[in-house]
Each structure stands twice: as C-alpha cells, then as structure tokens.
Amino acid sequence: MSRVLVTGAYGFLGRYVVRELLAYGYEVVAFGRKRDKLEALRADGAEAAELFVGDFCRQEDITAATKGVDFVIHAGALSTVWGKRSDFMETNVRGTQRVVRACKQNKVKRLVFVSSPSIYAGKCDRLNIREEDYDASNRLNYYIESKILAEKVLREQRSVPCVILRPRGLFGIGDSSIIPRLIKANRRSGIPLFRGGHNLVDITCVENAALALRLAVESEAAVGQVYNITNGEPQEFRAILEELFRALGETPRYLRLPLGLLYGVATLSERVYRLFRLDGEPPFTRYTICMLGYSQTLNIEKAERELGYRPIVSLRTGIRKYAKGER
C-alpha cells in the first residue's frame, strides 16, 4: 500500500486525515514539530502511524521526511486571523516552497495542499462560489494573502503533480477554534449577531474534509485541479447556532450589532494594533466581521464530479456528535 506523509499531523484536521488514511490501509508518516503531541495522536487511534518530528520550514527536515514517500498531504499551516505578516509568509508560503522542493528531490508522486476558502472573503454576500471565483489581490488579512501566494507557488511549478483543496469552516470533536469560540462568547456576553443572523453559512464536518483529502490522493483526475469542500448544506447562521445550543442544552444569547459600524471599528482596531504593536488580537477584525455578517456558500459540484466526494457526516449529525463529546 502507498506511503503518505501528513504535515500538521497533530492539528485538528491532520488528526482526522491520519486516521482516515490508516483506516484505508495506507502507511502513514505523521509529521509535526512536537513529539509529545505526535505521541498523543498515536495513542488516540493512530497506533500504526510512523512519527517524524520536524519542521517543514526547515528544508533538511522535510526533505528527510519525504524519502520513500509516495504522497504528501500538506495540512500544516499558520492558521489564525491575526499575526505578523513575516510569520505567515515564512510558514505558509516559504514553508510550502520547501515542501515542493522536498517532493521534487524525493520524486513524490503527488502533493495535496490544504488551502482555504478564506480567499473568497470580502465585504459582501457571495453565493455558490466556484473555485475560480476569487480575487488574487485579496488582502483582507495576512493569512488570506499567504494562502493565495502559496497556491501561486504550486501553480507556477511544474516538477510535482499537485492538488489543491479548500475546505470551509471545519468543525467536530477536537475543534479548538470555531465552535469553542461561539460557546465561550455565549457564556460571556453573547454571540455577535449581524443582520438578524440570516446570512448563509456553509461549513464542513471535519470527517468529510478528511475523506476529501484521501480521495484527492487516490483520484488521477484530481492532478492539477482545485476543489471546494463543504458539507453542501448551507444554513442561516442563526439556525446553526440554535441547533448547536439546543444539542448542548444551553440557550443562545445574542448581541445584535450594526454590521457597517462594527466593520469600521474593526478597521480602526487593526490599524491601532499595528501602529502601536499591541499584543494579542483586536476584539474584532475585518475578516471576523465578514465571516459573521455576510453569506458565503461554495459550489462543490466539481469535487462531487471528479473526486466522487459525498459527505458522510451530515451537519446535524456533526453538531450532535460535537455536543455529546462536550457534555
């Protein structure tokens, strides 16, 4: 069976990808910087994984790790809405360049890259977005810029066959980002709600994203292609919140806020934090306001047609599984 290296293996998505590949008989090399977290991954359903401690931003590490590997899934990244541009460029752009060099040197058959539909984000509603429907000059935040540039690196090189996936809004057991933030906000002052929460949200159970990545490894038709990945079940933001907190046995509390005003506040906050080099993250960022206030749905027909992608965990099931794990 083929041998697959997964970068970012102990991250939220990476853990599910490792287990998905092992379940289908692949030999898996779990790559990450911290041995204790890799050991914890192996103890949590990935006993058969080989561990490789390293940093893909170090050329010697990723080159050594890719020896004897057939496929690489590059899921490692600096994924946050705020930070220094230099950090995003080093990790997400130059780090990807080093992964490509390693794959070329070791004759890896295919590199599957985890990008982000954050590149579609903006100050407007966007529905049924196709893979080509993005602005390459989008600079809403440094993360978006870095993912656009990383994709450019992959498109412009010709030495390694590549596939790019853009999974949207991952959630599930082990999530430390989207749902935990909503729960935390609800238990404090309330969840920010813009436009009555009627904006459409298109999110993805993490198990479905892991499935899509395995399919990208297996499908010859995928080489050179880009795919949107979601659950294919767009829902109003407020409806998702109601479902989530009903499953948790809690009552959602909302902070109804004016969208335009908060976008202006976020813009000013970002400038102040940059100018004075303040620690931490602004209370609101333009990206966060766009994600909470505007509709964004993705067209996944290409993934369905070419990868044979069919979500295996429904939105409702995913929410209930998460809630059960939280209780």
Name each model-derived stretch.
Residues 4-24:
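N-terminal Rossmann NAD(P)H-binding glycine-rich loop of SDR-like oxidoreductase domains
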Residues 50-91, 102, 122:
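NAD(P)H-binding glycine-rich loop region in Rossmannoid oxidoreductase-like domains
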Residues 57, 87-98, 145-146, 204:
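Glycine-rich NAD(P)-binding loop of the Rossmann-fold in SDR/ketoreductase-type enzymes
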Residues 98-142:
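Conserved Rossmann-fold NAD(P)-dependent oxidoreductase catalytic core, especially the SDR/UDP-sugar
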Residues 125-171, 191:
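Catalytic helix-loop patch of NAD(P)-dependent Rossmann-fold dehydrogenases
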Residues 149-150, 176-181, 195-217, 224-228:
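Substrate-positioning beta->alpha
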Residues 172, 194-199, 227-234, 245-248, ...:
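Glycine-rich Rossmann NAD(P)(H)-binding loop
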Residues 215-282, 300, 316, 320-323:
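Mid/C-terminal beta-alpha module of Rossmann-like enzyme folds, strongest
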